[in-house]
Regions:
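Alpha/beta catalytic cores of nucleotide-metabolism and tRNA/nucleoside-modifying enzymes
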Residues: 1-24, 104-105, 165-166, 173-176, ...
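Terminal amphipathic helices with adjacent charged low-complexity linkers/tails
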Residues: 76-91, 127, 131-143, 147, ...
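Glycine-rich phosphate-binding active-site loops on the catalytic face of alpha/beta enzymes
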Residues: 67-82, 245-257, 296-314, 344-378
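Catalytic beta/alpha-barrel core
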Residues: 74-77, 103-104, 124-126, 164-165, ...
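Bateman/CBS regulatory modules and CBS-like beta-alpha motifs in cytosolic regions of diverse proteins
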Residues: 30-44, 51-53, 82-120, 127-129, ...
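Catalytic cores of alpha/beta
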Residues: 60-63, 235-243, 282-300, 340, ...
Length: 490
């Protein structure tokens, strides 16, 4: 009997199996501090991360996530060049001062300017000579009525009486110059008139519109990106670093392997200043192994996602609440943050995950229905949906995620063993609407627990295990819902 019992290491719980216990509180929900850590050196103003999935996070989602205080992880089901370009798009989306603005040479044409504006989503481009000296600026107003695409840009750019500021000009001073001259783009030049940056009125305005936006030291939005473990992993990492990525995630279905750590060591040795997060894992042993080998963050979750079938297909997994609890306890005090990836169904699951020890939560299905996700929009029976698929689905594997499930050597689609499905989720509108509900639920949970910040929630949060009857009692019951709430459906 004992021999049989030794095979059972314990009992696994999900978020539905527990509730946080209310505690004495002297803080209001609006007063709590929800800042946290994404990785060893990357902070979050909101502890929410969008998943590296090809129906969840591309540049639009990453921009919106960072503007709301979180961070997006760009998926890798694309070429290295495409992924690097999306990193650059996020980094250029807004800035205190754009330190590497898109420029065009004096030989450029109207067609070149229009193409660049469309590619990068910008409204003005400085024109420089071969020595990077500023010669003019062209804006979308200059191009709006120009029909001749072959016309040289020098014929329509503004070159006389250019308004510029010197290096070291503060944003407050720049705002005065912009308003005083009624312009939207302000080139920053050095003593020899070389272009060193660009300040835009739009970026200054966003500082007040999005005060909790997650930005780097240059005022640019933060963004992370995923790499795999195959031959191009280090090359992909190099391109991402050169594009300005803030953190890299080595994204696999099973992070507790020698091959994953080999990639981790190689990336860290070549790019020591970049934080590298590794996942996915579910045990204390895996967490210690990755931390001991230099991981700057660990991602927890084997099979909790709504579109994941790993636990059914492979018979392997770990209920998510227990996995987060075990991993967080194992590496407590190491300075390495924990990302709880998957299994978040309701806003109340967020404070549960954080109280269990996670520093942030990664979401897929709850974000896939937003306007900013790259999933296809579908009309079904008169309602709007967006497509959502697991990275272990056959369709996603065909696009490039086979290595995540260690099937990269298999070319025959019929021989792929999927660990995910393809589905749809209801359309939810713009991301900021959903984020308000996520943040509101987190703040409410922290208020009930008397936690002034996330570290306090992690230290003092206590749970009660509930039965199936307790779960039923927690949900609306004995009533027909006649008006849907924005943060609840079942």
């Amino acid at each position: 009997m004992n021999a049989h019992n030794s095979k059972i290491i314990g009992e696994g719980l999900t978020y539905d199996d527990v509730l946080l216990v209310p505690n004495y509180s002297n803080v209001l929900p609006r007063e709590v501090n929800i800042q946290s850590k994404f990785s060893r050196n990357i902070t979050l103003n909101v502890p929410i991360v969008s998943a590296a999935m090809d129906t969840v996070t591309e540049s639009a989602m990453a921009i919106a996530m960072a503007q709301e205080g979180g961070i997006g992880v760009l998926h890798k089901n694309m070429t290295i060049e495409q992924q690097a370009a999306k990193v650059r798009k996020v980094k250029r989306a807004e800035s205190g001062m754009i330190i590497d603005p898109v420029t065009l040479p004096l030989t450029a044409t109207v067609a070149d300017a229009k193409a660049a504006m469309k590619e990068f989503g910008i409204g003005g481009i400085p024109i420089v000579d071969e020595h990077k000296k500023l010669k003019g600026i062209v804006t979308n107003r200059d191009l709006r009525f120009e029909k001749n695409s072959a016309r040289p840009i020098v014929e329509i750019m503004t070159s006389e009486n250019l308004v510029t500021v010197a290096e070291g000009t503060s944003l407050e001073q720049a705002e005065v110059v912009l308003q005083g001259n009624k312009i939207e783009k302000l080139p920053v030049v050095d003593a020899s008139y070389k272009l060193v940056g660009l300040i835009t009125f739009r970026d200054i305005t966003k500082l007040t519109q999005k005060p909790i936006a997650n930005k780097d030291t240059f005022g640019r939005l933060r963004v992370a990106a995923a790499i795999g473990v195959t031959g191009d992993a280090v090359k992909r990492a190099e391109a991402l670093v050169n594009a300005g990525v803030d953190a890299i995630i080595i994204d696999t279905a099973h992070g507790h392997t020698e091959g994953v750590v080999n990639v981790l060591k190689e990336v860290k040795s070549q790019f020591p200043k970049i934080d590298v997060i590794v996942g996915n894992i579910a045990t204390a042993e895996a967490a210690k192994y990755l931390v001991d080998n230099g991981a700057d963050g660990v991602k927890v979750g084997i099979g909790p996602g709504s579109i994941c079938t790993t636990r059914i297909v492979a018979g392997v997994g770990f209920p998510q609440f227990s996995a987060v609890l075990e991993v967080a306890a194992a590496i407590k005090g190491s300075g390495v943050p924990v990302i709880a990836d998957g299994g978040i169904r309701y806003t109340g699951d967020i404070p549960k995950a954080l109280a269990a020890g996670a520093d942030s939560v990664m979401m897929g299905s709850l974000l896939a229905g937003t306007k900013e996700s790259p999933g296809e929009t579908i009309i079904f029976e008169g309602r709007k949906f967006k497509s959502y698929r697991g990275m272990g689905s056959v369709e996603a594997m065909q696009e490039g995620s086979k290595d995540r499930y260690f099937q990269d050597v298999e070319d025959d689609i019929k021989k792929l063993v999927p660990e995910g499905i393809v589905g749809r989720v209801p359309y939810k509108g713009e991301l900021n609407e959903s984020m308000q509900q996520f943040i509101g639920g987190l703040r409410a949970g922290m208020g009930y627990c008397g936690s002034k910040d996330i570290s306090t929630l992690q230290e003092t949060g206590r749970f009660v295990r509930i039965t199936t009857s307790g779960i039923n009692e927690s949900h609306p019951h004995n009533v027909t819902i006649t008006k849907e709430a924005p943060n609840y459906s079942r």
